[in-house]
Amino acid sequence: MDSIASIGASSGGHAGIEIMDIEGNRGYSIHGHDHFPMMSVFKFPIALYFLDQADHGKITLDETLTIKKKDWEKTFSPMLNKYKEDTIRITIRDLLIAIIQVGDNVACDVLLARAGGPPIVNAYIHSLGIAEIDIVVTETQMAADPKTMYDNWCSPAAMNALLQLFYQGHILSATNTALLLQWMTGAITGPHRLKGLLPASTIVAHRTGTSGTSPDGLSVATNDVGIITLPNGHHLCLTVFIMDSQAGEATREGAIARVAQLAYDTMSAGK
């Protein structure tokens, strides 16, 4: 898959790509151990933490947390836009669905506060044997100081390893593995990224991450990571991180889609 490198280069930024056919035990990597800003991709590890806590009886997904809308007026939150009242109570389950399916930033920071802060989630992910990742700042902190967007970083190899451990049932119970896969398959963000050029019927369980674009046209991060079900029944873990690109959104997203398409075609054919 040598042309994967040329697709990555076409993104206009620094591209990190990690591909693994789980059942076929075949992979491909470009800049697999470099550090890339995750943006909302870090909501996948947050979901793993809370579902693991539920598996061990430390929380229940039906526990409710209180949110005051006036505290979050400037924060991206499709979830809160559904409510007219200022003070609302939302279950951990619904907060997790919101971070996975729409990348809700309020839900993310409320969950991080409930966990005890980013370092708690970070330590949990490290305890799984995933070393090349740092989760140290909240969405609120990243919004206040854009330089901190680089502080929540992960290598493509580490993210793909985390995806594989999760999919193979080495992290969560069978019930919660299936639940998170269901939520990730229902994600509505990034339709033109991993899913963009695949057959419409393809099952893609994924989580995107996206920065804003600076006035001079720099996009810090355009990401998509996930698990793709192939026609031969195999499952493809795929991480694509694009960092510091000056290209337009269509170019960045198109590069991710082309990587996914080539990986899908190659691994499906057994090449």
What are these regions (language model features)?
Residues M1-D34:
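Beta-lactamase-like hydrolase cores
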Residues H14, I88, D109-I171:
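Mid-domain, small-residue-enriched loop/turn segments at the edges of structured enzyme/sensor domains
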Residues W72-D109, P118:
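Conserved catalytic neighborhood of penicillin-recognizing serine enzymes
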Residues G16-M20, S29, P45, T66, ...:
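Soluble periplasmic/extracytoplasmic beta-strand elements of cell-envelope proteins
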Residues I22, L61-P78, A115-G116, W183:
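Acidic helix-start/capping segments at beta-turn-to-alpha-helix junctions
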Residues D52-D71, P118, N122, S173-T177:
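Short, well-structured active-site flanking segments
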Residues N25, P37-L65, L238:
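Active-site SXXK
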Residues M1-I7, G27, A113-R114, P118-P119, ...:
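Structured C-terminal helix/loop/strand segments within mature extracytoplasmic catalytic/sensor domains
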